[in-house]
Amino acid sequence: MSNIAKAFADGKAFIPFITCGDPDLKTTAAAIHAMAANGADLIELGIPFSAPTAEGPVIQGANLRALQAGATTDKVFDLVREVRRDVTIPLVFMTYANVVFSYGAERFLSTCAEIGIDGLILPDLPYEEKDEFAPLCRQYGVDLISMIAPTSENRIAMIAKEAEGFLYIVSSLGVTGTRSEIKTDLAAIVKVVRENTKTPCAIGFGISTPEQAAKMTGIADGAIVGSAIIKLLEQYGTAAPEQIGAYVKRMKDAVRG
C-alpha cells in the first residue's frame, strides 16, 4: 500500500495545506509537526510561486510573504528533509508547473523521491498535458494527483480512470478561499468518480469549519483545508503552530465523527 493510500485506509482523512516559508521556514516546520501530532492524515505543502493563479487573496498573500522572506524551492526541499526525520504521514507538494520546469523536471522529481515527497499537485496543469510530467513521476515513485472541477460526467470519468494517490475534487469553480456555503452538486461528482476508480477522493476549496468538513467527508473520503490555516499564520505569525495544532484537532475530530 502506498503512503498516500494509508492516509485514507482507516477512515475519513483530514488534509491541511500550508505555504512553505510564511512567515518563515522555521515556523512552517513547527506547523507541520503540530499538524501531524494533532491528527492530520496527509499534509499539502505549497512551494511559493509569484503568480499562483488558482489561489484567492489569502494564499496569494502567503506566497508573496514567503518569497519576500527568502523562500526558494531548494530551501523548501531542505525543510522537508528536516521534518522527514520524524514526520511519517504522507507529504504532497502543491505548486505550479513553472516552478517544476524552471527547477528542471527530472531534478525536481528525483529530489522529491530522495526527501520523501509522496505526491505532486499542479493546479495549472491541464489533464491533456499531464504526460509532460506523468512518466517522470512514475519513474521516481511520486503520485501525480489530478484535480477535478465541476465539469461533464465524461471528463470526470476520464480523469478518474487514470487517478493516482488521491483525487482532489474542487468544490466550486474559481479560486481558493473560505466560503459560507458550497453549492456544487458534489455527491454527483463523487458518484461518477467512484464508478470509475478505487482511488480515494478528497474535497477542497472553501472548507473552513468543522461542520463543513464533516459534511464534505460525508460525501467524499477526505476534506482539504488551506485558507483557514493561512489566516491563522497571518494572525499569529511565529506563534501560529500551537493555534494550527488545535484547529487541526477540531477538524480531524469532525471528519471522524
Show where each model-derived region lies.
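Active-site-adjacent beta->alpha loops and helix N-cap segments on the catalytic face
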Residues: 1-7, 50-59, 71-81, 101-107, ...
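N-terminal amphipathic alpha-helix/helix-capping segment at the start of soluble metabolic enzymes
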Residues: 1-18, 80-85, 256
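Hydrophobic faces of well-ordered beta-strands that scaffold small-molecule active sites
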Residues: 14-18, 43-45, 91-95, 120-122, ...
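Conserved, mostly hydrophobic/aromatic
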Residues: 16, 35, 46, 112, ...
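Catalytic cores of alpha/beta
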Residues: 25-35, 151-161, 203, 207-223
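Glycine-rich phosphate-binding active-site loops on the catalytic face of alpha/beta enzymes
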Residues: 40-50, 117-121, 126, 171-177, ...
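Active-site beta->alpha loop and helix N-cap motifs at the rims of alpha/beta catalytic domains
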Residues: 47, 60-122, 255
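Alpha/beta catalytic cores of nucleotide-metabolism and tRNA/nucleoside-modifying enzymes
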Residues: 76, 191-199, 208-257
